[in-house]
Amino acid sequence: MWTESVDLHCHSWHSDGLHSPTEMAERAFQSGVKVWSLTDHDTDTGWQEASDACEKLGMRFIPGVEITCEVELQSETKDPSSWHLLAYFPDGASQEFSDWLLSLKDARVPRMKLMLQALSEMGYDIPIEDVAKFAEGSLGRPHLARAMVEHGIVESVSEAFEKWIGNGAPAFRERPLPNVSEAVKMVHQSGGLTSLAHPYYYGIEIDVLVPTLLRLGVD
């Protein structure tokens, strides 16, 4: 989310971004940002590098993460496979939260293996190492899509999602996700604050979404 001097939603190559935390911090600084948060998907592995970069640049760093959660409300117009909860820790997160986050990150690996198995059964063999080399942290579908491009299965990342690994596509597989209330509880126990990422993405009317978020404990 952008204002003139604040950016609180940003990804690095520790999840589905293409650049290091240092590079992303430098880009933010060059754009006039003074307060910045790195919010990679389900991982905090980029925090230390991001914090060090911000200290050198004179920016304030707020540790953050984008937690993938179960869908809480069904939409008549869209079919997202998950909701994304942003969590921020101005005073840093606890070890308990980091351990919980690690369990979410680890759960991505079995799911990736199932998707690779599905592709293999359709005649497309991709070693998991060829996917993992694109990921410095959380292993996700964008990394699989890039591996599919490299293997010549598709011409672009968007084609990979549209034809093979997007929601409901032939090689798509679900993975266990926390519900929003559980994630909020873990964040609050560690002294953090929560917000729903890109609220218009889910296809829920705001006058329905906001009361639901309040009921679930989202800040």
Residue ranges and their predicted role:
Residues 17-18, 109-117, 122-205:
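Divalent metal-binding pocket/active-site signature
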Residues 23-35, 95-96, 102-118:
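Alpha-helical scaffold segments that flank or form the walls of functional sites
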